């Protein structure tokens, strides 16, 4: 069993993170964010940067630099017209920082994606009949969803140090779980719904 697992992992090694590509991208699929509002966009969607303490500013800069290295964010030049900006904040958990976009304003205009999300009790009921269970986790799963050029313009974040464009799906967008579930059901069409 161990040798078979190693052989499968080696055969599909391009599907796993590496030093050369620490964050993968779902190939052949782009996420399109559609808003239920006409241009020019309301001022509500042009949020200013939130005030931040020196500690939070340092953490924001660190988070932004990490996401830029991973190809999740890019700096928006000063000559680019920016119609939508979402402020970001830093949250702390066990002295570790995480940057979070305040997408509440954008989400009010986001057309909901009603793709079904499995309920945990149904999943656990299906799994209870199985003898072996395999668990897989994606590093920064939402960030593996590439955004369309149109969506990138809607998902620009603003901080004290500049304006940045999301190239991948950020956390906090209303439809992110639905998009991700659709991808998982496409990759594993029967395994997620039937067990086994």
PLM regions with names:
Residues 64, 124, 136-139, 191-192, ...:
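Residues that mediate protein self-association or partner binding, especially
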Residues 11, 66, 122-126, 182, ...:
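Residue-level signal for well-ordered alpha-helical scaffold segments within enzymatic catalytic domains
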Residues 154-161:
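Active-site-adjacent bridging/hinge elements
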Residues 94-107, 119, 123-144:
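Conserved catalytic palm subdomain of right-hand nucleotidyl-transferase polymerases, strongest
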Residues 1-114, 162, 195-196:
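Reverse-transcribing Pol proteins
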Residues 57-58, 131, 142, 161-196:
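Conserved pre-motif C helix in the palm subdomain of viral-like polymerases
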Residues 137, 150-153:
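Extended, low-complexity cationic-aromatic segments
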Residues 111-112, 145-147:
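Short acidic, glycine/serine/threonine-rich loops at helix termini
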